[in-house]
Amino acid sequence: MDKRTFLKVGGLAGAGLLATPLVSSLLGCGSAPGPNTNGSETTASGFTLPELGFAYDALEPVVDEKTMRIHHGKHHAGYVRKLNNALKTHTPSGQSLEALLAALTPKDTGLRNNGGGHFNHALFWKVLTPATEQSQQVPAGTLAERIQASFGSQEALLQNLAAAAGSRFGSGWVWLVQDVNRPEKLFVASTPNQDNPLMTGIVDASIQGRPILGLDVWEHAYYLNYQNRRSDYVNAVLNRVNWSEVADLMA
């Protein structure tokens, strides 16, 4: 699915977000198997594990190599494998991961957990960087303007993200989300487990939208290096955000 593919599904078809590239295509998430011309088989094996875009040790000392190898090569790979297995009991449609997630209901446990796990991790890897270039470390252009308008400053945004991570009980994710009805508005949200703001049939309407930054606060993301010091991990990893990539994910 190319970067000019459009999405119109459920709550994601809000004003200003109709003619925008799919987030999942930008992340390299792939798409579900699609039907052959005879409708009896699939033309693809399903979703695939995206490359990191950097070496496993490239985020050290913020995230250690062992954690990265386990997190990407085992946890994320496991979500992809289980997602493809779960899709075997559903009619192949060739739809994007975004469309799949937006159509889920609370009864779709396997697709919810593993589809969410795949998308969430793909986004996480996309917005991390080992680089220290100023252009990547500081929001610029339209993103900077929207952060200023929505939060007052970049520092206030980072404080909001850290606070949301600290208040998330147990496992989950923290998000910077673009409002579906007011694209100029950004807000911070948090979801449990592998839920995300794309799941319009599951998450509360107040946190639905287009996720442009995701922060993993499951213990497997940090425990080897930080043990129970989640706040230390959060503050450190926020210094490895590639704001240029975040900007590219906006509608």
Where are these regions (language model features)?
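Short His/Asp/Glu-rich catalytic/ion-coordination signatures at enzyme active sites or charged loops
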Residues: 51-75
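C-terminal segment of N-terminal export signals and the immediately downstream linker at the start
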Residues: 22-59
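An amphipathic alpha-helical core segment
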Residues: 163-166, 171-227, 235-241
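N-terminal export signals
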Residues: 5-27
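All-alpha RGS (Regulator of G-protein Signaling) helical domain and cognate RGS-like helical scaffolds
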Residues: 42-46, 74, 80, 84-94, ...
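Low-complexity, Gly/Ser/Thr/Pro-rich intrinsically disordered linker/tail segments
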Residues: 244-249
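Acidic/His metal-coordination segments adjacent to aromatic residues that form catalytic metal sites
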Residues: 58-62, 101-106, 202-203
